[in-house]
């Protein structure tokens, strides 16, 4: 170890006891002379040069935080051995906080802190120091870096990241079960003293919970804590620094602990016996009532399953578990009958669906109760002995024959008499009827299987004492067949025979049908009504027969048509038969037997249109003619609707003003000057569209200028109409251009007038009322005038 290193260790050891003293001055130790080969090199003048190596022996200062003194806090002192004390050197400080937070005395090198420092904001500051010549401003020492470390004091209390914690733990947990861990932080320096050493303790929540001092883990402290007794707990935890010693700072937090539910409670019925009532008329599936077992647990731990385990009504009732309400709904399983049984007893069991094996020791998680269901009597409708009836009857029975009987009874204990009726909507033809007292069904009209083989009837049974109580039943009547119809030709046969036919030639194969339906099937026999020399019938014994010729050759000019009666009979009892006539035409044929032409009568219809087609064509023509005539008549009767139906019907209607045509023939152009006539505007005209009710003095309107426009003219007339006291109290058409009826005069000249003033009739003035009598006398004249 060199002497230089030894001196550095010595200075460090000497300063250790004084680290906490802020007034301690750190001075630069005298330079240590280390001679090297270069430093001992001789000068040119023969003298040996000695270079002195200088170094700062300090590299850090220590400063306590949160200084509360009134003066600047002393940090330390910088000093160079070049400083002679004459003020020739100047100390300069730079780096973190230099000049603001830390200042240096330029002459003495003393460093001070200008304000209080918080270590939690910044733990150390790095600065640089340099000594320069005040006159030359040249450094006498190289710039050196040092650190000011801030010593921590216990000025921060522990804090929790959350003011309130929320935690949960299952109820009935064992002692020591971990609930939650809370952790507090301290901003003080954990490496210096006990300022940041936190100890946890519980202030509130004992004796239910405890906390580990070092870790902050909260654990249960009591066994078998029951949620049903108390569900919420509030625990206050304290975190204290300085290892929990007196004088340490502390912080608290609140932990809300909830006991979560476990299935530790069995379901319980609140009553040992439950009474329910149900009407006997309730259909299957009707809810009778509900039972519910209470469970102190919650959620799935309280889910209950209900079932009927015993009783005399297990076949009549069922129970369904309602998941939403946790109720057992008892429903009707089979139809009930008050007269048969009036009381049922059920034993219902409720059991938890989720059982925790840890709590088997608490007992069975099930409970039972007795449910008694009383059946209430209602006035029931009659009950038929069958759900439906089927009667079979032959179609040839006489009217009034009983075909069957329906039976019904009143299920009530009163046994009210029953009245039977037939729903006529199911028997519109009134073929059947029923005896109202005993339900005997009989015919009222003859039956015909060929018209209807089945009849679907509805019989109504009603109580006589209470006709509203009715029941319906279906009665199916099947009509059995009787051989009452003779067989007939299946189709109409158009048969012909060739003139060159030979004996035994087949000309037609015939068949028959019968409306009857015998049990053994149809069997027909064919024969001729009488022996025929021209044709014969050969029965094929398969319900068909062949028509054969018996002679050689036919002549259509002699006989054009033959009528062959054929007898068709069946084999049922009684035997029915009919005679069908087969029309055979004689036609000319080729060598192959193909028909070429027949008689004139036979060829008439095929050559032209049929009678039905001709009738249809004539009807179409007649219908078209009728349509044309009706259309023409409607066109003649159509009239043009008038613009205004009457003078009274002019309110709120559109009025056309251009219905005077195009003017007189001698008019060359429209002259707006006629509307600019001041005299016409100023003239106060009487309205003649209505009868005046009062006389009033005409008012003279101000003289309008000559340049009056059409708009001003219309506005003046509108104002005049609004101020007219004789105007009706509704909007009406005011006709100012009224010129009266057509004049009887042939000319405007008085010389050419065909009438005199005396011929004018002013009698209408008398119809205006007494107020216009004077005017009527002036113009109408009196009786004396007439006599004169």
Curated annotation (Swiss-Prot):
GO terms for molecular function: calcium ion binding. The keyword Translocase does not apply. One of its GO terms (biological process) is homophilic cell adhesion via plasma membrane adhesion molecules. Pfam families: CADH_Y-type_LIR (PF01049), Cadherin (PF00028). Keywords: Calcium, Cell adhesion, Cell membrane, Cleavage on pair of basic residues, Glycoprotein, Membrane, Metal-binding, Phosphoprotein, Repeat, Signal, Transmembrane, Transmembrane helix. Residues 635-788 are cytoplasmic. Residues 23-613 are extracellular. This is Cadherin-10. It comes from Mus musculus (Mouse). The gene is Cdh10.
């Amino acid at each position: 170890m060199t002497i230089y290193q030894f001196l550095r260790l010595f200075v460090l050891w000497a300063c250790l006891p004084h680290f906490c003293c802020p007034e301690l001055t750190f001075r630069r130790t005298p330079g240590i002379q280390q001679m090297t080969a270069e430093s001992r090199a001789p000068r040119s003048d023969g003298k040996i040069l000695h270079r002195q190596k200088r170094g700062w022996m300090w590299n850090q200062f220590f400063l306590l935080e949160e200084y509360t003194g009134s003066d600047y806090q002393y940090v330390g002192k910088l000093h160079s051995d070049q400083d002679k004390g004459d003020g020739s050197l100047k100390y300069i400080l730079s780096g973190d906080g230099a000049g603001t937070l830390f200042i240096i005395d330029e002459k003495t090198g003393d460093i001070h802190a200008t304000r209080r420092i918080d270590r939690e904001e910044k733990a150390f500051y790095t600065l640089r120091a340099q000594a320069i010549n005040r006159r030359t401003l040249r450094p006498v020492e190289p710039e050196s870096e040092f650190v000011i470390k801030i010593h921590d004091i216990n000025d921060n209390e522990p804090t929790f990241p959350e003011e309130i914690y929320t935690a949960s733990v299952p109820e009935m947990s064992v002692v020591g079960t971990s609930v939650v861990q809370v952790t507090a932080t301290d901003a003080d320096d954990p490496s210096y003293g006990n300022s940041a050493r936190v100890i946890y303790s519980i202030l509130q929540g004992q004796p239910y919970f405890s906390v580990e001092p070092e870790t902050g883990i909260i654990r249960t402290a009591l066994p078998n804590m029951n949620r049903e007794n108390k569900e919420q707990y509030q625990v206050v935890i304290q975190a204290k620094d300085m290892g929990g010693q007196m004088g340490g700072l502390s912080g608290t937090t609140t932990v809300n602990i909830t006991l979560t539910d476990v299935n530790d409670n069995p379901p319980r019925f609140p009553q040992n016996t439950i009474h329910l009532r149900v009407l006997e008329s309730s259909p299957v599936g009707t809810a009778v009532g509900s039972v519910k077992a209470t469970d102190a647990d919650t959620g799935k731990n309280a889910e209950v399953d209900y079932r009927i385990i015993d009783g005399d009504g297990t076949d009549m009732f069922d129970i369904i578990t309602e998941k939403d309400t946790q109720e057992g709904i008892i429903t009707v399983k089979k139809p009930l009958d008050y007269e048969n049984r009036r009381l049922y007893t059920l034993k219902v069991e409720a059991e938890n669906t989720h059982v925790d094996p840890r709590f088997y020791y608490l007992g069975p998680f099930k409970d039972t109760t007795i449910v008694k269901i009383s059946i209430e009597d209602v006035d029931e409708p009659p009950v038929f002995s069958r759900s439906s009836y089927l009667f079979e009857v032959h179609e040839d029975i006489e009217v009034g024959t009983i075909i069957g009987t329906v039976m019904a009874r009143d299920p009530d204990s009163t046994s009210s008499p029953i009245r039977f009726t037939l729903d006529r909507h199911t028997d519109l033809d009134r073929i059947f009827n029923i005896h109202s007292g005993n339900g005997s069904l009989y015919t009222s009209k003859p039956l015909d299987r060929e018209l209807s083989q089945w009849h679907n009837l509805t019989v109504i049974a009603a109580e006589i004492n209470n006709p509203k109580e009715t029941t319906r039943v279906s009665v199916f009547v099947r009509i059995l067949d009787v051989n009452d119809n003779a067989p007939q030709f299946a189709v109409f046969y158009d048969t012909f025979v060739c003139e060159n036919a030979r004996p035994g030639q087949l000309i037609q194969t015939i068949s028959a049908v019968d409306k009857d339906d015998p049990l053994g099937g149809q069997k027909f026999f064919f024969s001729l009504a009488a022996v025929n020399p021209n044709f014969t019938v050969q029965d094929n014994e398969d319900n068909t027969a062949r028509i054969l010729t018996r002679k050689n050759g036919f002549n259509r000019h002699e006989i054009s048509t033959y009528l062959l009666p054929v007898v068709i009979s069946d084999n049922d009892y009684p035997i029915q038969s009919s005679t069908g006539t087969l029309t055979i035409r004689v036609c000319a044929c080729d060598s192959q037997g193909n028909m070429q032409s027949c008689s004139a009568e036979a060829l008439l219809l095929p050559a032209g249109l049929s009678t039905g087609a001709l009738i249809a064509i004539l009807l179409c023509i007649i219908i078209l003619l009728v349509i044309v005539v009706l259309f023409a008549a409607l066109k003649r009767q159509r009239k043009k609707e008038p613009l205004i139906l009457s003078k009274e019907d002019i309110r709120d209607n559109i009025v056309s003003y251009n219905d005077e045509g195009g003017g007189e023939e001698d008019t060359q152009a429209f002259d707006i000057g006629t509307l600019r006539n001041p005299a016409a505007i100023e003239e106060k005209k009487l309205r003649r569209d209505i009868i005046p009710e009062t006389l009033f003095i005409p008012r003279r309107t101000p003289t309008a200028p000559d340049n009056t426009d059409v708009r001003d003219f219309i506005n003046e007339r509108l104002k005049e109409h609004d101020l007219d006291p004789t105007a009706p109290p509704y909007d009406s058409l005011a006709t100012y251009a009224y010129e009266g009826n057509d004049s009887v005069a042939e000319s405007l000249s008085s010389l050419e007038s065909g009438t005199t003033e005396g011929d004018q009739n002013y009698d209408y003035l008398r119809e205006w009322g007494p107020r216009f009598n004077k005017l009527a006398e002036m113009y109408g004249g009196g009786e004396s005038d007439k006599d004169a």
